[in-house]
A protein has these predicted regions:
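Catalytic-core regions of core metabolic enzymes
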Residues: 1-250
Length: 250
């Protein structure tokens, strides 16, 4: 601190605000420069069912900053007991080398880290400075640092908590994706996003596609994305999921 809400973990609570998330040893660790933003992120996470192992709010970081908490987690990391998932909200990177070293070290130990770096624009830097006394850092420098460390960069609390939820899932095998939707537009956008991420959305055609199409409403598309139409039923959705799981290669 100052300008923080304290910390909480499965052994100790020093937070006097809500919401208080479900604490779980296998949940995520959240480190936030801002106390109010920690609560803001918690509100988003709770609605998604995302659980936390610990929450650290460092405020103005006059004594302990984000880098210090990461160093503590790295140097005391127990792969059997500690969370492998870290979410960060950062306004000031006071020691980029330390952040890089300990984030990279944790990732090599099997952790996954996602972070928001606020105040990377000129106006944002001014706002962050007035909020927590943050030192400005250019957007390109932040991008390079995160890429080198292996940190997934996020730009909103919804993106951060969604990535946190993805981190909790088992690792995916293969690069092929089937998209099932009841509206064409989202399917197109998701196809673009997956393709830009180096993943495949292979075209479905031939006997497999015709067999599936015959079991959906007229007008449904099965080329991948699979569009069951707005009038599609829950049974159609179940059918498509089972079909993709059983008959398509990953």
């Amino acid at each position: 601190g100052p300008n923080c809400i304290g910390l909480m973990n499965t052994w100790h609570h020093s937070v006097f605000s809500q919401p208080i998330p479900n604490l779980n040893l296998k949940g995520v660790d959240l480190i936030s420069s801002s106390g109010a933003t920690a609560v803001f992120i918690l509100e988003s996470a709770v609605t998604k069912g995302l659980q936390f192992n610990s929450v650290w709010s460092v405020g103005n970081a006059k004594q302990i900053g984000v880098e210090d908490v990461l160093q503590f987690m790295d140097e005391n990391f127990d792969p059997e007991k500690d969370s492998h998932l870290k979410l960060l909200y950062i306004e000031s990177i006071q020691n980029p080398d330390r952040l890089l070293f300990h984030a990279s070290s944790l990732i090599r130990k099997g952790c996954k880290i996602a972070a928001i770096k606020a105040g990377s624009s000129e106006s944002g830097s001014r706002a962050a400075s007035s909020h927590t006394g943050a030192i400005a850092s250019s957007d390109s420098a932040v991008e390079a640092l995160f890429r080198k460390a292996g940190i997934v960069r996020c730009f909103s609390r919804e993106e951060l908590t969604t990535v946190g939820c993805v981190f909790t899932l088992p690792e995916l095998k293969g690069k092929n994706f089937a998209i099932i939707t009841h509206a064409g537009g989202p399917g197109v956008m998701l196809t673009d996003a997956l393709s830009k991420g180096g993943l495949n959305v292979p075209k479905l055609e031939g006997e497999i596609a015709e067999e599936l199409k015959a079991r959906l409403f007229p007008g449904a598309a099965v080329g991948n994305p699979i569009d069951i139409l707005a009038t599609g039923t829950p049974e159609h959705l179940r059918l498509c999921i089972d079909y993709c799981e059983e008959k398509l290669d990953s």
